[in-house]
């Protein structure tokens, strides 16, 4: 089984940046406790304060699928969606 890595880049509306960061920090902490989560970091680029990155590592695709399909994920997306200008996710296999 291959380890799965995801980098998610969010462009956040300035007036919601602090709310978004706090929401993602809580999400990261909860995600780290999930079975199969090997890494879940919230990164704040120094050169662009409108962006927030998530870097995730999962044991395998099955662990990522459980995380992605959890009911809490739908609620999380519903909460932050109005705060975003853009979102880009890149999935990678880490061998």
Give the label of every model feature segment.
Residues 18, 62-65, 74:
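Alpha-helical elements of the RecA-like P-loop NTPase motor core of helicases
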Residues 13-14, 83:
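Short linear/disordered segments characteristic of secreted peptide precursors
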Residues 31-35, 61, 70:
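Acidic-histidine catalytic/liganding microenvironments
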Residues 27, 67, 72:
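Histidine-centered active-site/metal-ligand motif
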Residues 16-38, 76, 80:
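Short amphipathic alpha-helical segments
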Residues 2, 41-50, 76-95:
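Glycine-rich beta-strand-turn "strand-cap" elements at beta-sheet edges
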Residues 4-11, 41-68:
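Short, well-ordered beta-strand segments in beta-rich or mixed alpha/beta enzyme
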Residues 16, 50, 72:
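Short phosphate-engaging motifs
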């Amino acid at each position: 089984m291959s380890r799965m890595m995801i980098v998610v880049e969010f462009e956040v509306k300035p007036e919601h940046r602090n709310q978004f960061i706090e929401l993602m920090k809580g999400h990261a902490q909860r995600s780290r406790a999930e079975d199969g989560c090997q890494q879940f970091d919230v990164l704040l680029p120094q050169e662009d304060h409108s962006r927030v990155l998530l870097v995730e590592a999962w044991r395998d695709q099955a662990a990522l699928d459980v995380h992605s399909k959890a009911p809490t994920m739908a609620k999380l997306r519903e909460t932050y969606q109005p705060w975003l200008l853009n979102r880009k996710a890149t999935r990678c296999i880490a061998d």
